[in-house]
Amino acid sequence: MLVIGAGQAGLAAGYFLRHTNLRFQLVDAAPEIGHVWQTRYDSLRLFTPAKRNALPGLPFPGDPEHYPGKDDVAGYLRAYARTFALPVQLATRVTRLHARDGTFTAVTDRGALRARQVVIAVGAFGVPFIPPFARHLDPGVLQLHSSAYRHPAQLPAGRVLVVGCGNSGAQIAEELTRTHQVTVALGRRQPRLPQRLLGRDIFDWSDRVRLFDRSVDTPLGAFLRGHDPLIGTNLTARKLKVRPRVTGAVGRVVHFEDGTVASFGAVVWATGYRGGYAWLDLPVLNDRGEPLHARGVTSVPGVYFLGLSWQHTRSSALLGGVGRDAEYLAERIFEEHHRRSARDG
């Protein structure tokens, strides 16, 4: 049994695989557990309180009502792997995964690994996406994807454009208003929820209607997926300008959907990620390179995905939610293992 990825999804898978008594191995390209979190922007704070950020079996340390930073999360993941003695092989990048005669082979930069079942747990963040027209910006305009942003000092003084505004983009834009003249370009207006309401975290209130536990195949889940709210951020109350979608760029000038233009000295592309599954030599992706699955179970027996955005619910890619999907997949893996064992005799 091979688990590719040792972030929060892979570690949660390892926890439940321990309970199946199946032999398994986790591999990860990073030099240490929690590396992806440590390389995020310095001011990152989770929008879920610590009490909602626990993987199965280990509470998140500290005040249950505080909002952890990126280093807190990285440290927690390392402690989690130690606590449950999970078998993690680091600095091992999988460059190809293919199948032959019912066995999967993961080609890595440290040799080949073979398994009868594979969990692909590389997470919701694939390859950073920047629109193709960004190449038409003048070389003098500093461009950063949000994955490469660390702090305001990276950017030259003056006017900054933040393109795209999920929760990370909103946090970055808020931070930059203290040091720069900030414009935010929004593809669409997003619903906003306060971080706290009447003295309680918004997630405490949402529990009453199980808002973030609605599956993607329900009407409310489908609506939420298309209207993911910003939490704890009110951009209109900040010292920044809000523009519509960016449609193009030439030189130092950016064009917006409403026909207006403006020039900037720097652009932060908070435009998300794309698949990053080019190494998968298996029929488990659609024509856009996205995983084909039903709650992580693919049409190829023995191949599973874990940690995807909206894999089952809004919480699927969150620290406090991935465990439910991991438990579900561990049960399916155990069932498939026994079916195969019975068939093979």
Name each region found by the language model.
Residues 49-64, 212-213:
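Glycine-rich flavin
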Residues 42-54, 199-201:
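Short, flexible, mixed-charge acidic loops at enzyme active sites
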Residues 1-30, 34-36, 65-167, 171-345:
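Flavin (primarily FAD) cofactor-binding/catalytic cores of flavoenzymes
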